[in-house]
């Protein structure tokens, strides 16, 4: 009799070609990759220019943010900051408030020891191949395409920094599988990466980020759901439209047939000779840029039969535009940024804000939260006051428009000039008058001078000076 393991392996061999899935076995439990995640890269990002453009718009935003190591000095402000920064419609006023809370909650670590010094080094160069910004962007790219992001930490196994990462790598999520135990809830015990060989890592070494997955099967819910899975039909249609359009241009063949429909020419030989003469005349007299606009004349009745339809007539180009809009919606990217809808300065500015707040910041925040969780659990900094975060102040498109600020503050009856300068992002003026209320009459002046002037006017109705 076959052992239970042999029987399960036999089941795996039967299931793999039928399901298009990959399986691992841990204590008799099959763990399946829920769908062919490699296809989202092969048939999406690698060959579809719309998907490529959308994903890279997001990744370019992600690369902008610098990272730093902090210590928490105000837990309450940190919670408020995290709550604000998770909003996908962050207003300029809320953005300014978030910057203030971040400064109040976190203090940069400047005097590093051997442990925090290594962590600071990783925030510059996580491995031999990438900067930290590129490393974060690459991981987010996997998450956008496959729904999963795996960070492997090569932990030091001895010395003063034992348990601390010495390097960080992204595992390609399309070829990484989860190893799990049976039972409910399903428990992850490790991860398996299939490259030039099979590599297995305990769960303590890997940080796994994923999008929520409502699909339950053989532990399918342990994997994230790829956004492109919901757009699978749109991608398939768009790729087919591009193939049809390319085929039309590359294999154009005959566009039309010119025929003789003259009752006076009845014999086949005569029609053939006339067709031949017409062809020669068209080639010699009516082709080329210099002959554009010439009118051809024939003494015989002739006709034209069009063959096939153009991509415009087939509606391919219009369908591609709508596919682009739908794919933008999947990722929360404004379609103005890939040029499929009309653009003006104002809507491009608003689109850049939406790209940052709706697409880039959620990915950056997720990376930060998972990284800090691993530092406080498995990566050597349990119980220590260290906090990794990105600097959101570089996204200046989120701040309020200075012209709008000046416009509404100038309409106030009374305002302190330094308040106006601060709102506009300028440093306060040290002149004490700039901290006083100024009022708007015919012009602007300090409230104190305005009040003295009003008293003088009341005491001297004839505008006589008082000694």
Label every PLM stretch briefly.
Residues 139, 147, 269-290, 308-419, ...:
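C-terminal amphipathic alpha-helical
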Residues 1-312, 316, 322, 326, ...:
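Structured, contiguous alpha/beta core segments that scaffold functional sites
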């Amino acid at each position: 009799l076959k052992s239970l393991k042999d029987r399960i392996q036999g089941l795996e061999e039967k299931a793999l070609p039928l399901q298009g899935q990959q399986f691992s076995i841990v204590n008799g439990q099959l763990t399946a990759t829920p769908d062919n995640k490699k296809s989202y890269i092969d048939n999406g990002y690698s060959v579809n220019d719309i998907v490529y453009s959308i994903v890279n718009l997001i990744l370019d935003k992600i690369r902008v943010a610098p990272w730093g190591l902090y210590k928490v000095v105000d837990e309450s402000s940190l919670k408020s900051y995290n709550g604000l920064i998770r909003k996908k419609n962050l207003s300029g006023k809320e953005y300014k408030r978030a910057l203030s809370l971040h400064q109040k909650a976190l203090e940069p670590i400047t005097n590093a020891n051997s442990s925090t010094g290594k962590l600071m080094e990783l925030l510059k160069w996580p491995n031999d191949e990438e900067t930290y910004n590129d490393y974060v962007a690459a991981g987010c790219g996997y998450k956008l395409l496959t729904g999963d992001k795996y960070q492997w930490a090569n932990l030091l196994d001895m010395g003063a920094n034992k348990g601390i990462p010495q390097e960080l790598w992204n595992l390609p999520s399309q070829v990484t599988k989860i190893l799990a135990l049976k039972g409910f809830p399903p428990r992850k015990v490790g991860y398996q990466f299939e490259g030039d060989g099979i590599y297995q890592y305990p769960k303590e070494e890997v940080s796994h980020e994923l999008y929520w997955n409502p699909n339950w099967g053989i532990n399918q819910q342990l994997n994230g759901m790829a956004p492109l899975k919901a757009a699978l039909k749109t991608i398939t249609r768009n790729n087919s439209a591009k193939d049809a359009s390319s085929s039309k241009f590359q294999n154009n063949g005959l566009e039309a047939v010119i025929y003789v429909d003259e009752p006076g020419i009845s014999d086949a030989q005569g029609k053939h000779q006339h067709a031949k003469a017409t062809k020669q005349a068209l080639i010699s007299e009516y082709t080329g840029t210099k002959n554009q606009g010439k009118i051809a004349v024939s003494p015989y009745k002739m006709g034209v039969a069009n063959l096939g339809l153009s991509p415009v007539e087939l509606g391919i180009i219009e369908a591609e535009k709508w596919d682009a809009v739908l794919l933008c919606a999947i990722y929360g990217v404004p379609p103005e940024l890939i040029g499929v809808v009309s653009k003006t300065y104002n809507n491009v500015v608003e689109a850049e804000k939406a790209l940052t707040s709706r697409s880039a910041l959620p990915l950056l925040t997720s990376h930060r939260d998972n990284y800090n969780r691993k530092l406080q659990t498995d990566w050597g900094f349990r119980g220590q006051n260290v906090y990794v975060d990105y600097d959101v102040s570089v996204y200046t498109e989120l701040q309020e428009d200075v012209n709008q600020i000046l416009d509404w503050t100038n309409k106030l009856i009374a305002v302190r000039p330094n308040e106006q300068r601060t709102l506009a992002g300028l440093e306060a003026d040290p002149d004490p008058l700039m901290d006083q209320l100024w009022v708007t009459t015919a012009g602007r002046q300090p409230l104190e001078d305005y009040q003295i002037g009003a008293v003088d006017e009341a005491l001297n109705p004839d505008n006589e000076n008082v000694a």
